[in-house]
Amino acid sequence: MISTRGNWPLVPTMDVVVPHARTMADLLEVLDVIVADDAETRGDFWRAQPWVTLPLSSEVRPESYDALAAEAATALRGIRIGIPRMYINADPDAGTAAEPGIGGPTGQRIETRASVIERWESARRDLESAGATVIEVDFPVVSNYEGDRPGAPTIATRGLVSPEYLRREIVDLSAWGWEDFLQANGDPGLHTLAAVDGATIFPHPEGALPDRYTGFDDDIAEYPEWVRANPGIGFQDMPELADGLRGLEETRRLDLEEWMDEHELDAVVFPAVADVGPADMDVNEASADLGWRNGTWIANGNLTVRHLGIPTVTVPMGLMSDIGMPIGLTFVGRAYDDTALLRLAAGFEAIGAPGERRTPPPRTPAL
């Protein structure tokens, strides 16, 4: 819904603009300004591509985001919410596939910290007290993306998206996106990726432990060479893209939207992360083992959420009682359910004990 034009692309099919704000009220005010139609499509791949039709922002946004705050008091009443068992240590099949995942720790069992579970249980009580029904569910959109259990496919083996497309997307399309951004930006000091030494992109810090991104196809250090070897190539010249993009849309429709309809769910929620990695995980092997676990290395949902165009809103759930780190609750919905999710997130923020979920950082002096 928010134009990505002007943002440095990472993976054009996955990139989104994500506003961060102190409160839902602040966020809604920001959205009233930045959610707008953008006539210029260069720099926003999804609006530039011709194969999947997207609505205009003005067709799916409310007249006023700020007005949603007035609905917070009753937003959760009668709502049916699913909590995936895989994120609350309640799914014995998660992570039991012989070779789970699509790279890194994806597909492995998620071990959610006890203090995160405490915050979730408190949040669940508040949701139910506000009139929501919360049920524990499977989560096929992640299981069928990551192959986390026996019999589950991955995004590459499902048959809706080809392996050839997935490689084209993460290598050719991404390198093209970087190059197009630099050319559009027109910085006289650097206007082409071809002028960059790939070895200087994301260099490994001296003394740091090896990263654990094993299994992924991309090496961003090779992007400059791709640009040098493919002058003048655009995304229209990549034959796998049309079917690949349609396959991503169909995957979301089958594994999330039809599944939500089947369970009569208005939304899905889960803790934003399973744990927080130790600060020394770059140099301490034991800490790295903790920090690179599924659910900890990046947020719960991994690549699935952004790759399939699934909207989410995350709001504070409180501090972990043992380590004092904040934890969020992520609300998930169908494509273009953004407004409904914002309404639910505002409703969640409005309930619970005062100061329970959002507290000033203890090391930060008061203003």
Annotate each predicted stretch with a short phrase.
Residues P12, L28, T154, G177, ...:
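Glycine-rich, small-residue loops and helix-cap segments
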Residues P92-R113, R228-I233, S287-R293:
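A solvent-exposed, charged loop/short amphipathic helix patch at secondary-structure junctions
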Residues M1-G103, E121, D126-E128, T133, ...:
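Structural helix-boundary/capping segments
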Residues R124, Y165, L173-W178:
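Phosphate/diphosphate-binding loops
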Residues D66-A70, I110-D138, E179, Q183-N185, ...:
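Acyltransferase
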Residues S129-G151, P231-G234:
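Short connector loops at secondary-structure junctions
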Residues N144-D172, D282-N284:
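Charged, often glycine-rich, active-site loop that binds/positions anionic groups
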Residues M14-V18, G107-T112, A242-R246:
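Active-site rim elements
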